[in-house]
Amino acid sequence: MIKNSNINSNSRLDDPILQEIELNKVEIGKHASWSVSSAKPGSGVEQLRDNNLDTFWQSDAQQPHHITIQFPKKCYIENLLIHCDYKLDESYTPCKISIKAGTILHDLQEIILTELEEPSGWINIPLSFNNNSLKANLLQISILSNLKNGRDSHIRQIKVYGKKISIENYTQYPKFNSPEVSMFQTLR
């Protein structure tokens, strides 16, 4: 478990944090099934994933609040980006977050525990350790507490990123640059 990981934050969907990550990584959250422990009507998973920073997921129960992201098979996960906005959400803003990973709900292990101070923008949580991507079927984000002892939470967006895999990486064949050699790389 890592406490207070290397976290950067910024706001906007076109900000430098997102642009840098999207150069070498791909958003894999679209391949997962998302669920939340509770939600106010009109503020559910759809708003968490709609690429609109004006909408948000809002919990509607006692803490801790959970967001569960389940992939159909094990995935290599590199980064988790969470968008919070203290200026707009005040006591609804999470301040203590736990990230757990595993294959099913019953074998989750906490990998990151972090505390946030008035976050405003994208929070980049790296999930690769010692140059090894996290490999998991299931991610669970738990909001353990909010700023100003707030009860319910707002999260405006969440994105999950994995490595971009090219055909060269997948097959382990080198990429040929010259036409003379490239014409012999496939069989008829």
Swiss-Prot record:
Alphabetically ordered keywords of this record: Cell cycle, Cell division, Mitosis, Nucleus, Ubl conjugation pathway
GO cellular component labels: anaphase-promoting complex
Coiled-coil segments: none
Pfam family, one: ANAPC10
The DOC domain, residue ranges: 4-187
Keyword Acyltransferase (UniProt): no
Any Gene Ontology biological process: protein K11-linked ubiquitination
PROSITE patterns xrefs: DOC
Subcellular location: Nucleus
InterPro entries found in the cross-reference section: APC10/Doc1, APC_su10/DOC_dom, Galactose-bd-like_sf
The keyword Methyltransferase is assigned to this record: no
Recorded superkingdom: Eukaryota
Family matches, as SMART domains: APC10
Pathway named in the protein's UniProt entry: Protein modification; protein ubiquitination
CDD domains documented for this protein: APC10
Main location: nucleus
Family statement drawn from the similarity comment of this UniProt entry: Belongs to the APC10 family.
Quaternary context: The APC/C is composed of at least 13 subunits that stay tightly associated throughout the cell cycle: anapc1, anapc2, anapc3, anapc4, anapc5, anapc6, anapc7, anapc8, anapc10, anapc11, cdc20, cdc26 and cdh1.
Role: Component of the anaphase promoting complex/cyclosome (APC/C), a cell cycle-regulated E3 ubiquitin-protein ligase complex that controls progression through mitosis and the G1 phase of the cell cycle.
Name this polypeptide is given: Anaphase-promoting complex subunit 10
